[in-house]
Amino acid sequence: MVRIVRSIGVCILSLAAGATFPARADQQDSAGGDDQQSSQPQVVVTGHSLQEKNAELDAARDRNLLPKLGATDYSIDQQDLQTLPQGKNTPLDKVVLQIPGVSYDSAISNPDFHVRNEYANVQYRINGIQLPDGVSALGPVLGTDFVGSMSLLDGTLPAQYGLRTAGVLDITTKSQFDQGGTLDIYGGSWSTVSPSVEYGGSGGASQYFLSGRYLQSEQGLESATPTANPIHDDTSQERFFGYGSTFLDDADRLTYMTGAWVGRFQIPNVLGEQPLGDYGPDTLSSADINENEKDRFFFALVALQTHRDDLDTQLSVFTRYASINFMPDPYYDLAFNDVAANVVRKSLLNGLQFDAAWRWSDAHTLRAGFVTTIEHTQVQDLATVLPVAPDGVVLPTPLTVNDYTQKTGWIAGVYGQDEWRLRPNLTLNTGVRFDQLNQFVSANQVSPRIVLVYDPVADTTLHAGISRYFTPPMQAQATPSDLALFQNTTQQPAIPLDDPVRPERATYVDLGLEQKLLAALTAGADVYYKHGTDMLDDGTFGNAAVLSQFNYALGYSKGAELKLNYQHDGLRIYGNYAHEITKAKDVISNQYLIGDPVELAYLASNYTYASDAQTNTASAGASYRWQETFASFDGIYGSGLRAGFANLQHSPDYTQCNAAVGRYFHPWPSGDKPLTLRLSAVNLFDRIYVLRAATGVGEFAPQYGPRRGIFGEITQQF
């Protein structure tokens, strides 16, 4: 299989590099460079001309290879990122909370946000290249340091977006690479210290950008207690990103990226828990438990983009390694939980992606492509448990059980679509994709997509679409467990059922409107309905802070979103609201995870809320810049995640507000390298709220939102 993929890639690379098409006299596309001849001498450019050429190919890629065509699109540019209260120190998963339909969850849920109440079914793309998901680490593996702009696409997606379909986080890297960079020091509450550095430049036909960040804090995860100072919650993290591009000639650009993230976390302790009494003395304190986790994520990719006449292509090869290691407290975990499980998950993935767009005529743009990945996973649950005698007595003589599984699986998808401009203000985009999955189960699906985009009058856009989706489980999270190994131990499951996890299949309908009310004021509304079979969900079952997946037989989601945005000169004000309901019934895979036979029986015959569902969510913010001074404020609201037996209850609603004030200074003679000072507050009003009550389906422990934190930042350009 690997040889086949390699051979296909070489052939396509050769064809893409050498493809030429005659220019048509009637071509009206405004893409820069479309009127250039198919054969050009090698170009070596520097300075602004290189930046302009890169910007031209970036625009061609985004316009021709990555159209949004009826998907609900929420964009955040560099200015938006800088005006957030924490600026570029805002974690990526906190940035998206300011988008309608995105709700807050704990880091253990990874990512700690949900798009339209779905589990972690989010696809990440960097410059159009799909970044494969990992094994659900406890922190955001991507930062915002390298982000030039980003968009969240959801709803009815065009056919090139497959597999992870709740949302597509489409990131475009920074593109202004003057010789220079920034030094940044950020820190404050909970002994937080986070220095970072960026540097970018160019030479000849190449440009590059590097960024690195270190973080240490005494609040790494959501605290298990409502106290101002979390107990056993330290973290240290390192993150690196590197980007480069080189023009091979005037129409061919080679791009290369690499990134790394390593995170170490203490697992927060719950106060007041009592030992079970089967092992060790009953005088132990749960505040002294010492559980830890170490996560790693590394990726690298190379992409060749061509932009010739009526044809655009991009071929990319990528690799990704991810691992998590949950390390228990061998003594205390046995005393409090009757099990101490060392859980290791490793995943090595290699892949190939190709996208092409051909402007066949003024009315039709044809697009096609494929993606294939090969993944090898290793999952080990090295559990120390206590034996149980035939009469039910737990024996205080620990034994070790090694539940180990490895698997090499693959996924392949191919798509084709036609963007048909029926009239200048009416576009019909039709497409179809085919996906084949071969992991712990084998399955495939043909998924048609159709969407209509209509501009009835100036400043008004309507879209309506319907799509079929095919979502495979994450191989590392869907690994089966050998339940027989745990017979007659304290880990023997109460439900001896472990049917394999299947891919989700769904039909998605989305309708939306965007209206420019005034020159500086826009509003939008969107409604959607999704119905699926084998609906995927996940949770943290047992006593290790790792996610496992399972299926509901049936599920549906429906909702409505509203947004309002005002931007004029230095003032920006926005507000978002979403009302959403997501329900499912009948757990049909990994049933043993549920733990309670009564709860499983109830779920078999009743629709219940999905664990990640919140009925009402909202976000709002404002920022203002006056000369060299700026201030910003934002906030989120949630009606509460699910709780209780079969998720029939929910946690209390909550709000969190953040604010910042800052100023630009020009202490150096040149005046063009400002020094920036910023003072920010997280949870400004110190609201105490619980995210997870540890009583719903697949909940690990109580998780509270952060208490008020005060932070300072100094940034110097150089």
What are these regions (language model features)?
Residues P140, G148-L157, V168-S202, L210-G212, ...:
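Short strand-turn segments of transmembrane beta-barrel domains in outer membranes
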